[in-house]
Amino acid sequence: HDDELGHQLDAIPDQLAFLLGQEAWESLAERFGGRRRYWFVGGGPNVATAYEAALKLSEAAWASAIGLECEQFLHGPWAALEPDDVVFVIAPPGPSHARCHDVARVAAGIGATVVALVAEADREIGSLAAETIALPEVPELLSPITAAVPLQLLIYHFAVRAGANPDTVREQTPHGRARASVTP
């Protein structure tokens, strides 16, 4: 069992290289940039992926972003969703896939743009999405690795499109100075 997991881990760099070469990241940033709010929703181990992506988008591109677990989103925050928002549904195969599908159904039903990070063969969530990013097939436990990297690259392009330096986190603006005043 450990050998199988080790082999799957060893394959991830090549899978990511292939994935990163498949998408037109600048074009995606152009299509989905400048929106009111961005939602990143995942289940299982990809709750952390959703939180991290929202944090990075806020830091790098100065955009309003929120990361949520599927059940959190479906409990109440969905009511704040608007048609101009973008919802990234991080839904590789695994136990959380069904609830991620529910998230995509709600978001699409409201008229928000859905971007699905799913297995290439996924037709359930993929059919609801304006764009799909096909993730390599790995166990759900390893999927945060394969989902976080393309999101980071897309967020970089969101930042560049917005004219923000993704490495400075507004250090030279009143925002950065205000935060620095409370950080030792």
Predicted regions and their residues:
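A SIS-like phosphosugar-recognition module
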Residues: H1-P184
